[in-house]
């Protein structure tokens, strides 16, 4: 580029110097500098009138019509790599100001435009391809340029067509003046005029002059008559072309007459997409797709019904669109064709997305514009007929004015109803889209029905055929999706007219549970512990119950689950993204599920050996304490782990170590085996090493209020159930810590027999658990909260949550609110005098390390 620019500067001494960009734009000079020779030739005129105009009609010419804005396009290195920026608009302005001396200078500037594009952009860039297309058009036009170049007068600007107009005007004015002055002037003047005319045409004798002078008065009258006749004939001939023009204008009005007032906003929207404002992304849709020119041989095989903006405009002008929904259908069809043929990531696909975004926004604004137009139209309606009636003098004219008045009133009435028509058309389009979706769903259901029928027939013949679990899951997913859509659509449509409780309750009853979305309790936000317990319960659900959970999420939160996630084998749910109503409904569904069996996941109630920790006694004691004091101390267990395997292995090692010790301390050791060590309130570890005999085990993981929750929960064993609470508030479990002092443990009367083998199932606390154990199960090792799990029974029947109402006469909502407040107060009071969990864990680990090494 540097050598080429040096050669050009040597050959063209008047070339414009390199300029610095101003706000990212370099505008080359347009006016010729002082002393530069300029001229206008026939070849330059051909470039200005033909070449540049044909290039300006190309759809890819828009990036080259103005100087490059490096700031707006975020290309700061453009002016460093491009020495002489140039554009087609600058070339056109130079031609108009006679900047060039020959056509070759103009052609060099045109070549500079495209060479700059090829230099800065890559070979496969979209702008490079567009530049090649425009360059080919200009080359073809230059092939037809005149070969010989000669000078030519400038015929534009201030001197545009002045000489031709002045000559013709003087001649016509002089002839008219002569015609007008001829009959009114004196005979001598007329004679001189006639003689001058005759001498100009041919030589005449002097006798003819006298004869002409003698006959002048008659010629005056004749001249007057002929002049009048000529004037009348001219007046008669002049209105004829005007009438013809008026007739043509009327024909054009008749062409646009079928355009309804409701279609005027659509026409305006269509014209807006043809402007430069939207051509950045709308240019691929301006004209029909030329598959042969673009090399798209499979386009018409994939796209059965092509559509473009030009075809839509032709249909709009011909009155083919009767409703705005027809216009919207064609726009949607054009965009569907774009998305169907062009894959994701293609530039045309991205242009289609931008076009769709702008169209949706503008289409939503059409209702407001039509309402404003309808509000303005009735104001001007009564004013129009008054001047027509005043001007009417003949009896025929009032009829015409009445007809026009009727037409205006009909158009105004239709304009006033345009908003209603727009809403009706939108509703019709929604119904049509719904019909298409239902047809697709019906086809899918029919296919699944055929498969199920064939499987049923085969199983009747061969009972040993494997069960089609995948087909059953597809059927459930299809049915639950349809139920969710129907429920959401029906509730949305009837929300303004009637209560939607029956619709949602009906959808919930299909799965055997009751859920009232209008209840205030179901709208309350879930706490962190409630979400964690719900997550654990969902993880333990069988596969056949997970489909109902997915259907609830689809019905409540459509954006939470995508079809892509449903196709995968595993679906991850983020509870933070789900709504409170969705989580409450999932909790209501889980409450109706009977007790799970097998794999150690079931949680069955087990009574304690201690009679004071029975369900009735515990419930009475806790209720009496709640009624007297109104608050309860928090039971905090330091030795309870959140891992089942860690807890079982630690207890097994404790039993083995206790059995290996002396018989003199066997009683105490056996008592300590089943009762984990009790840490002190200050957070210090126990004083004896026997309480931490399981030093080889890893430190227990605590499920605390300030840290992350454990992944699983270990319920308390039957021997560590909560005992009854006395008057001094000293009731405590054998493995838990209570303030202000622990409950006394009765001394054993005899040596304890060896511990019996424990069942593999995880034990569970009875109904006598404390309030904190009920509300915060994972923190203190209790069972799940009662509002997420019904009382387990041996039967597998599905029960409604109304069956487990408290029998003490207290409202369920009041009880839950009271329990929450008590738990909050107890947690605040305990946190004030306790050490953080992290410090406790560090001290426990240090103590175990010292005892071990």
Curated annotation (Swiss-Prot):
SMART domains: BROMO (SM00297). Residues 141-153, 394-410, 819-832 have a biased composition (Basic and acidic residues). Changing residue 253 to R: No effect on the interaction with smo-1 and ubc-9. Its main location: nucleus. GO terms for biological process: cell fate specification; chromatin remodeling; multicellular organismal locomotion; muscle cell cellular homeostasis; negative regulation of cell fate specification; negative regulation of DNA-templated transcription; neuroblast fate specification; protein localization to chromatin. It comes from the Eukaryota. Expressed in T-cells, Q-cells, V5-cells and their descendants such as somatic gonad and syncytium. Residues 1-19, 684-696, 786-807 have a biased composition (Polar residues). Residues 166-175, 192-215, 369-381, 612-624, 708-736 have a biased composition (Low complexity). Residues 1-22, 141-245, 369-418, 594-814, 819-838 are annotated as: Disordered. Residues 419-458 form a coiled coil. It is found in: Nucleus; Chromosome. Changing residue 315 to R: No effect on the interaction with smo-1. Changing residue 313 to R: No effect on the interaction with smo-1. GO terms for cellular component: chromatin; chromosome; metaphase plate; nucleus. Residues 39-145, 257-366 form the Bromo domain. Keywords: Bromodomain, Chromosome, Coiled coil, Isopeptide bond, Nucleus, Repeat, Transcription, Transcription regulation, Ubl conjugation. Interacts with acetylated histone H4. Interacts (via BROMO domain 2) with smo-1 and ubc-9. Required for the establishment and maintenance of stable cell fate in several lineages including V5.pa, T, Z1/Z4 and QR lineages probably by repressing the expression of cell fate determinants. Required to maintain non-distal tip cell (DTC) fate of somatic gonadal cells through the htz-1-mediated repression of transcription factor ceh-22. Regulates the subnuclear localization of histone variant htz-1 in somatic gonadal cells. Plays a role in the attenuation of the let-60/ras pathway, probably by preventing expression of activators of the pathway. Involved in adult locomotion. The BROMO domain 2 is essential for the interaction with smo-1 and E2 enzyme ubc-9. PANTHER family: BROMODOMAIN-CONTAINING PROTEIN BET-1-RELATED, FALZ-RELATED BROMODOMAIN-CONTAINING PROTEINS. This is Bromodomain-containing protein bet-1. The lineage of its organism: Eukaryota, Metazoa, Ecdysozoa, Nematoda, Chromadorea.
């Amino acid at each position: 580029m540097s050598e080429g620019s040096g050669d050009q500067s040597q050959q063209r001494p008047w070339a414009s110097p390199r300029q610095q960009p101003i706000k990212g734009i370099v505008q080359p000079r347009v006016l010729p500098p002082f002393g530069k020779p300029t001229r206008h030739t026939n070849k330059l005129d051909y470039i200005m009138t033909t070449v540049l105009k044909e290039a300006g009609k190309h759809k890819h010419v828009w990036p080259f019509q103005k100087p490059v804005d490096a700031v707006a396009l975020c290309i700061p290195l453009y002016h460093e790599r491009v020495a002489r920026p140039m554009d087609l608009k600058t070339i056109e302005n130079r031609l108009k100001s006679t900047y060039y001396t020959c056509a070759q200078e103009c052609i060099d500037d045109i070549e500079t435009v495209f060479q700059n594009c090829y230099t800065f952009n890559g070979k496969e860039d979209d702008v490079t391809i567009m530049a090649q297309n425009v360059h080919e058009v200009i080359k073809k036009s230059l092939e037809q340029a005149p070969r010989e170049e000669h000078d030519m007068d400038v015929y534009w600007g201030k001197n545009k067509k002045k000489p031709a107009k002045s000559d013709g005007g003087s001649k016509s004015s002089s002839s008219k003046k002569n015609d007008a002055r001829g009959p009114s002037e004196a005979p001598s003047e007329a004679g001189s005029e006639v003689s001058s005319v005759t001498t100009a045409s041919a030589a005449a004798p002097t006798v003819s002059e006298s004869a002409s002078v003698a006959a002048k008065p008659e010629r005056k009258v004749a001249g007057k008559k002929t002049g009048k006749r000529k004037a009348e004939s001219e007046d008669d001939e002049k209105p004829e072309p005007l009438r013809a023009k008026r007739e043509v204008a009327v024909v054009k009005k008749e062409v646009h007459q079928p355009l309804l007032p409701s279609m005027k906003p659509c026409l305006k929207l269509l014209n807006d997409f043809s402007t430069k404002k939207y051509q950045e992304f709308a240019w691929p849709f301006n004209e029909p797709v030329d598959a042969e020119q673009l090399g798209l041989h499979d386009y018409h095989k994939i796209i059965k019904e092509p559509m473009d903006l030009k075809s839509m405009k032709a249909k709009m002008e011909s009155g083919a669109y009767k409703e705005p929904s027809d216009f919207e259908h064609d726009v949607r069809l054009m965009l569907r064709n774009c998305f169907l043929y062009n894959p994701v990531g293609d530039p045309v696909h991205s242009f289609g997305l931008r076009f769709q975004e702008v169209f949706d926004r503008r289409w939503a604004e059409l209702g407001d514009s039509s309402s404003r137009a309808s509000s303005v139209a009735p104001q001007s309606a009564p004013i129009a007929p008054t001047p027509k009636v005043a001007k009417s003098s003949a009896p025929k004219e009032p009829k015409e004015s009445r007809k026009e008045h009727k037409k205006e009133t009909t158009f105004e009435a239709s304009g006033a109803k345009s908003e209603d028509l727009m809403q009706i058309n939108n509703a019709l389009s929604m119904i049509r889209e719904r019909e298409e979706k239902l047809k697709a769903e019906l086809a899918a259901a029919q296919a699944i029905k055929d498969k199920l029928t064939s499987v049923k027939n085969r199983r009747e013949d061969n009972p040993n055929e494997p069960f089609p679990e995948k087909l059953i899951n597809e059927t459930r997913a299809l049915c639950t999706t349809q139920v969710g859509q129907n429920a959401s659509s029906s509730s949305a449509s009837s929300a303004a007219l009637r209560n939607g409780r029956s619709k949602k309750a009906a959808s919930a009853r299909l799965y055997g549970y009751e859920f009232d979305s209008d209840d205030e309790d179901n709208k309350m936000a879930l706490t962190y512990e409630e979400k964690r317990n719900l997550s654990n319960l969902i993880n333990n659900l069988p596969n056949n119950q997970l489909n109902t959970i997915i259907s609830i999420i689809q019905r409540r939160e459509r954006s939470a689950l995508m079809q892509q996630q449903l196709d995968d084998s595993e679906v991850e749910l983020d509870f933070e993204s789900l709504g409170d109503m969705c989580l409450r409904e999932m909790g209501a569904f889980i409450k109706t599920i009977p007790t799970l069996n097998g794999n150690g996941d079931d949680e069955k109630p087990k009574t304690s050996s201690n009679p004071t920790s029975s369900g009735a006694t515990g419930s009475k004691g806790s209720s009496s304490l709640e009624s007297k004091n109104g608050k309860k101390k928090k039971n905090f267990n330091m030795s309870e782990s959140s891992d089942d395997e860690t807890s079982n292995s630690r207890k097994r090692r404790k039993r083995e170590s206790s059995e290996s010790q002396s018989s003199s301390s066997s009683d105490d050791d056996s008592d300590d085996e089943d009762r984990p060590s009790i840490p002190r309130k200050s957070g210090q570890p126990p004083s004896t090493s026997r309480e931490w005999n399981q030093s080889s085990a890893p430190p227990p993981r605590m499920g605390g209020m300030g840290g992350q929750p454990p992944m699983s929960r270990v319920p308390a064993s039957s021997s560590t159930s909560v005992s009854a609470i006395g008057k001094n508030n000293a009731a405590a479990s054998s493995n838990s810590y209570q303030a202000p002092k622990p409950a006394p443990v009765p001394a054993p009367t005899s040596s304890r027999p060896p511990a019996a083998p424990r069942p593999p199932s995880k034990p569970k606390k009875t109904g006598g658990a404390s309030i904190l154990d009920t509300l915060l199960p994972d923190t203190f090792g209790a069972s799940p909260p009662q509002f997420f799990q019904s009382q387990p029974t041996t039967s597998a029947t599905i029960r409604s949550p109304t069956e487990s109402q408290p029998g003490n006469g207290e409202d369920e909502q009041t009880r839950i609110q009271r329990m929450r407040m008590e738990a909050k107060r107890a947690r605040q009071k305990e946190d004030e005098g306790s050490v953080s969990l992290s410090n406790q864990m560090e001290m426990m680990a240090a103590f175990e390390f010292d005892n071990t090494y």
